[in-house]
Design a protein with these regions (language model features):
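Glycine-rich phosphate/diphosphate-binding loop of Rossmann-like nucleotide-binding domains
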Residues: 1-41, 50, 55
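Glycine-rich oxoanion-binding loops at beta->alpha junctions
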Residues: 38-46, 110-111
Length: 164
């Protein structure tokens, strides 16, 4: 299946967005990509698209905001369980394994780094607050990308998608 590609913007309507978004829209529409159109942040998180294209600044703001919201939700659940009385504590004990799975899924140190696309090379960026576990995982992710020849695969896929 072809991944659904969206362009992160301030609204779904084609005319919305900054200069970069407006300039990118016809390039995506003219490609062989499965272009969904403009998407807002809620649609990225909600799964309407598989790939959200954005510039580094906006993408970083969205990423860090998403991480903060995830942490806030986890903290609120913990607080509600801790302060909710005996039944809440029992319920918390029952859901703890599931919550730990979700926490691990949302933990950026599990991957350690994300690829910076748009450069002619493999570049991975980690959090400035990465610990040894995150850095170890970042090296693992980067090594896997080198072993899988990801850069050439991305270049080939982009070249093919731009042919019409």
């Amino acid at each position: 299946p072809k991944p659904r590609v969206g362009l992160l913007s301030i609204g779904e309507e084609e005319g919305k967005g900054n200069h970069l978004v407006k300039e990118a829209t016809p390039l995506f529409k003219g490609s062989k990509l499965n272009y969904f159109g403009n998407v807002e942040g809620k649609e990225v998180i909600g799964g309407k698209v598989d790939v959200a294209v954005t510039d580094g600044f906006v993408g970083n703001v969205m990423l860090k905001t998403s991480e903060a919201v995830a942490k806030l939700i986890v903290d609120k659940i913990k607080s509600a369980i801790k302060n909710g009385g005996p039944l809440a504590l029992i319920g918390g004990a029952l859901v703890k394994p599931a919550l730990n799975q979700i926490k691990k899924l949302l933990d950026p140190s599990e991957e350690g780094a994300a690829p910076l696309l748009g450069v002619n090379g493999l570049v991975f960026i980690g959090h400035g607050r990465s610990d040894a576990f995150a850095i170890k995982n970042a090296v693992r992710v980067a090594k896997n990308a080198v072993d899988a020849n990801v850069l050439d695969a991305i270049k080939s896929a982009i070249e093919e998608s731009l042919k019409k």
